[in-house]
Amino acid sequence: MLLPHLNDFRDRIAARDADWRAGAVVYQVFVDRFAPAENFHAKTSLYPAPKRMRHWHETPAKGHFVESAGVWSHEIDFWGGDLQSVRAKLGHLEAIRADVLYLNPIHLAYTNHKYDSADYLEISPEYGTRADLRMLVGDAHARGLKVVLDGVFNHVGKRHRFFEEAMRDPHSPYRSWFFIGSEYPNGYRGWADVPNLPDLHVERDEVRDHLWRGPESAVRSYLRDGIDGWRLDVASDLGPHFLRELTEAAHEEKQGALVVGEIWNAPAGWDRALDGILNMNLRMTLLDYCSGRVDGHTTSHRLKDMVDDAGIEFILRCWSTLENHDTPRLARLVPDLAARRIAHTLQAALPGAPNLYYGQEVGTDGDADPENRAPMRWDLVRDDHEEWSYMRRLYSTRRSLRALSKGDVLFLSSRRLLAFLRTTDRTLETVLVLANMEDVAVTETLSVRDGRIMAGTDFRDALDYDRPDAMQVNVQMGFTTVTVPPKSVRILKVVPPRPGQHSPYKRMA
């Protein structure tokens, strides 16, 4: 790596420092399942049959199709969480060093997942009201947390009042909001041909006015309520042009707002439409590596291609996801704890905004929907729980290392390891990350390709810095020889010169 033009580098890092979206830790909450409501029994009237209330110790399972409701039974099983119970648990987000609270959909809808909107401008009563949301946002902001909502703007639920009127009255002005006709199997077009999810005709001006263009639109009005951004469901279905229009509307309404899209593709090119995407490309790469399907050398090349193609600024705002409400839990896909620790650590150390799905931090297990939406295991949030204890240390360390949230990335050539640097405008903030997925220790000599790293510089394990046996390596003439234990990962930071000691960095930034 050539010495960067220092002023340009400083300016780029300073811009990232000022942008809360770059490298933020995002904690995702499925509201019904995150924390039990204090008034659980008083809420029974909100769940009329065929909806069912479940107890917190129960786990969701695939159900049967309920003909009268037009949905599956597991879609209308409820555990009773709400916005007030989320407020009561904001301290947990602080403990994991989260920067952002992201809520799965909360607008009025029939199901527990709320991806079938019945009214965008109203909160589902099981969860609360717009006033409850404003109180949650206020409490979150007081703790330094941003709040992002899930926007489902490609389709609605069949119980949406506009859709019901459109189907009932051929002359309804809302008829043009949907794709209605005999050429469709159900008499209308549904997302993925699901009858419960009629597609919106977003080409219509009046539809976009209702969703994001108009002053009282969903996107704008919730931003005025204090939220800080939107995660867009099935964003690719909206198309780049309308995504750009929506993103611009959000930025116009609130400077610095975030619009991140659910895109199951490579991230390259989406920066022209969105602030970031859910980086499922990164997820596949990390799962392949931590499951032993590809080696460190191949993984390094895949990650470098991803960053080079999309650009580091965009990647820093993309959400680094290992699991969410649409995927099996990480503990199911990577059952080995040592391998899972590597996945967690790389999610935290690679460029991007780590997206932690509630319960990931305690190793919650579960297959695909609905198993991946189990109630939060609060009994596992304790100091002697190995995974929780490690995740707290990991994210406390991440917050203390500016390079991991705001820095550039430089992948190092290695035959068997995954190795990379995270760098900022301050050389002594450089971080070296080493991962070994093999069952044996690996020793290699790596070229440390940053010319600012002076001969004699030591790097030491940041998570175990004060332990006498903490891993430490030395750089000489741009090389370092490392031995990484089997199935392990290390985040190493520069050992700074002691006060009064000669420093080769005395005239280096």
What are these regions (language model features)?
Residues 1-146, 161, 487, 496, ...:
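N-terminal structural segment of carbohydrate-active enzymes
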Residues 18, 38-54, 112-126, 153-189, ...:
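Aromatic- and acidic-residue-enriched segments that line the glycan-binding/catalytic groove
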Residues 20-23, 31, 36-74, 78, ...:
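Loop/helix patches that line or flank the sugar-binding groove of alpha-linked glycan CAZymes
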Residues 25-27, 101-103, 147-149, 230, ...:
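Hydrophobic faces of well-ordered beta-strands that scaffold small-molecule active sites
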Residues 30-33, 101-111, 151-159, 233-239, ...:
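Short, solvent-exposed turn/loop segments enriched in Gly/Ser/Thr/Pro and often Arg
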Residues 68-84, 116-130, 195-210, 227-237, ...:
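The substrate-binding groove and active-site-proximal loops of carbohydrate-active enzymes
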Residues 137-146, 155, 160-171, 217, ...:
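Active-site-proximal helices and loops of the catalytic beta/alpha 8
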Residues 161-225, 235-236:
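Active-site-adjacent "subsite" loops/lids of carbohydrate-active enzymes
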